[in-house]
Amino acid sequence: MFKKKRPSRSFGPKLKNNPPAPPLRAVREVSSGGLVFKRMPRGVQFAVMLDSYGKWAFPKGHVELGEGLPEAAARETLEELGLDQVRLLEYLGKIDIWFRDRFEKHGALVHKDIHYFLFEALVDAELHPDPAEHAYEAKWVSSKQLFKASSYPDMVPIIKRALALVEQGV
């Protein structure tokens, strides 16, 4: 009437012979960027741009092979903001970020060092953002508005250093 079940020869659930998952590795990247200001009769103004994430930021980008950090920062200000006559003043520091790439590496974990430099532009410098370089809008903001204009909290120490240097007359 009832068929007898054969006893199992294993002790516990059957497991597939899967190798352990490899450790999660991050892609390392180095970028360089600039905080650009100009001295106006009514005070200092800094350039900010609307980036591909819809946030106000500063120009930055990957350092190309054979290129130094300051040269990369100057090139990025030219490509993203159209500023070709800027004067390098000072190294501002580095921020270290981790994120998931959504453009080139599609979800890859990225560990990026971003080096920032302080540049001075000519008084009559105009901003010409380039959407092809992920700079969708750009504007000059006063030093008082700079903290509110920057959308990224990790930029606070860099902004503080830039403002202190400009205040000292560098």
What are the language-model segments listed below?
Residues 57, 111, 140:
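Short aromatic/basic micro-patch
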Residues 1-41:
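Acidic, metal-coordinating catalytic segment for phosphate/diphosphate chemistry
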Residues 116-120, 127-159:
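NUDIX/MutT-family hydrolases
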Residues 82-124:
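Active-site segment of metal-dependent pyrophosphate-handling enzymes
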Residues 42-84:
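Conserved Nudix-box catalytic region and its N-terminal flanking loop in Nudix hydrolases
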Residues 40-45, 105-107:
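Short, solvent-exposed loop/turn segments that connect beta-strands within catalytic domains
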